[in-house]
Amino acid sequence: MDTSQEGYCFIMNSNIIEKALILGEKLSTLTSNDGKERSIFFTEESESIMGVGTEEIIIFCDTKEKKELEAYVDNNKKRDDLSHMHSHALDATFSVGDIQSVKGDWDENKINYQFVITSKHLFSIFIPPDLKYGLNLSKLLIGEYGKMDMSIWKRVGVKKFKEKDLGKGKKCINIPDCSDEQKIQHNRIWNEEFEKFFKRWNYINNNQLEYVVVQRKNR
């Protein structure tokens, strides 16, 4: 697989719950085994659908996709549900030699990034256009993806996905003005998407799909 293409990394974690998308600042570079530099960007979000704490998710995308995502966010900043955007800097350094390929699909209805972290892990992240609850993906989490700066992060475990975990998606992100009807709709969407994701990739990995749970240390 091609490891030379430029890629960008978005991280979502769990601090901003209400009506907020945090589009991160470019703050460091990633260097892969071939010596190519890759820039990293960060986003933050809040309580995850898996409901385990403050874990993170990392999304890699190429230059074109990053620009499209930023443009989408910029074009929607004046919407009430995206009116509290802020930038967040994170002083983490990553080694990304395991990144093998990055690709993504974009249309007006969805952002669907696919990326390979190692030869054994291929993930597809679905983010619906209504980002006020679309960011509720932070517990999908990541496979092994290289070395982390452990002064910033701590690894809290490796979990194997089990189909019984699908039921944990039945909660709505805590948006104050989210009606009961909206919560039902949100939960239905998330349960459907998580079920598709987990069943698909767990099957490909012979029911051995694992994800690494990491948590940012308190400063």
Predicted regions and their residues:
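Intrinsically disordered, compositionally biased low-complexity regions
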Residues: 1-32, 36
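Short beta-strand scaffold segments in enzyme catalytic cores
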Residues: 37-46, 114-117, 124
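Short HxH-centered metal-ligating active-site micro-motif
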Residues: 49-111, 118
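Active-site or metal-binding loop neighborhoods of secreted/extracellular toxin and effector enzymes
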Residues: 110, 114-219
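Exposed alpha-helical structural elements
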Residues: 15-22, 68, 101, 136
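Extended hydrophobic/Leu-rich segments
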Residues: 11, 17-20, 69, 73, ...
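An acidic- and aromatic-residue-enriched active-site/binding cleft used to recognize and process polar
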Residues: 31, 87-90, 119-121, 130
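Short secondary-structure boundary/capping segments within folded domains
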Residues: 29-33, 41, 73
